[in-house]
Regions:
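Active-site metal-binding loops of divalent metal-dependent hydrolases
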Residues: 131-132, 162, 190
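Metallo-beta-lactamase
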Residues: 101, 150, 192-258
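Internal hydrophobic scaffold segments of catalytic domains
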Residues: 5, 12, 19-23, 167-210
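Conserved beta-strand hairpin/beta-sheet module of binuclear metal-dependent hydrolase folds
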Residues: 91-152
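Extracellular/periplasmic catalytic domains that process cell-envelope and extracellular macromolecules
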Residues: 100-102, 111-112, 177-180, 254-255
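Active-site metal-binding motif and surrounding structural segment of the metallo-beta-lactamase
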Residues: 124-125, 136-186
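N-terminal pre-domain segments of enzymes
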Residues: 2-91, 95-96
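Flexible loop/turn segments at secondary-structure boundaries
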Residues: 115-116, 135-137, 164-166, 193-195
Length: 258
């Protein structure tokens, strides 16, 4: 027996229920659109180079590593009854992609992966904070920065913590062994242990959980995946890792990630 608030789960995607449609319509009427405008302006603030719907591919891979064109539908229709209006607006904000200047000598590439990658221009070269998920997305981010800020050597890389979208693109930033030796790689205490725990010991469970968490199997449309809150999704390229040769915190990684 199904109660009136339940629907039978089938393979067929459904329209919004009357209750959901009414709730979303009421929410839409009460949105502070001035605040939405402020957030839109902040998302575009200090953009040096805008990259609309970036597409990043990998040689001999049928599907792209990264493709924000899938989210163009967010700008092609009004807010549907199936999606909470605030989520719809958040989905638009996270499509913003390109090179941004945070402040003097600090730059970010946004919208090339789930996380952002930060470049600090030091006296002798770049200090890179976090490296995205994939080698390919990190390579494109570095290329974009070098094209518009001048090419500089990578003097240091900082892994802020052990989640894969913050270190997986390291070989896109430091592609050869010579650079690896000449560049300092800072990681929190316990970093490698945390990476192994998450991606080896708990790999099967974490992979299954991530499919629910990120909505990987959902279509990108008004009845599927809209956004992940902090970004669109993780990239599907080459995940890489090198061991940090410097320690930047006395605290265990598990503490830093809480």
């Amino acid at each position: 027996m199904l109660f009136d608030y339940e629907q039978e789960l089938t393979i067929h995607r459904k329209d919004a229920t009357q209750k959901t449609a009414a709730t979303n319509a009421e929410t839409y009427k009460n949105i502070d659109w001035e605040q939405v405008k402020v957030e839109q302006n902040l998302a575009d603030y200090q953009a040096l180079v805008r990259v609309p719907f970036p597409l990043i591919s990998k040689k001999n891979q049928l599907y792209p590593v990264w493709d924000l064109r899938k989210y163009a539908f967010l700008f092609e229709q009004s807010t549907p009854a199936t999606v909470h209006p605030k989520l719809w607006e958040q989905g638009k904000l996270n499509v913003q992609a390109g090179l941004y200047q945070v402040t003097e000598n600090i730059f970010q590439v946004r919208g090339f992966d789930m996380a952002n990658i930060t470049f600090v221009k030091g006296k002798t070269g770049w200090i890179v904070i976090d490296c995205l998920t994939s080698k390919e997305t990190a390579e494109e981010a570095l290329k974009l920065v070098n094209q518009h800020c001048g090419k500089h050597s990578i003097k240091a890389v900082i892994f802020s913590h052990s989640h894969i979208d913050h270190y997986g693109g390291i070989l896109g930033i430091l592609p050869d062994s010579t650079q690896n030796k000449n560049s300092k790689v800072y990681a929190p205490a316990g970093f490698m242990d945390a990476v192994i725990d998450e991606n080896v010991t708990a790999a099967t469970a974490m992979t299954r959980r991530s499919q629910y968490m990120y909505g990987i199997r959902l279509r990108r449309d008004e009845k599927g995946l809209i956004d992940n809150g902090i970004g669109k999704e993780i990239s599907f390229g080459t995940i890489t890792l090198i061991k940090g040769n410097r320690r930047n915190s006395p605290f265990p990684t598990s503490f830093l990630c809480k």
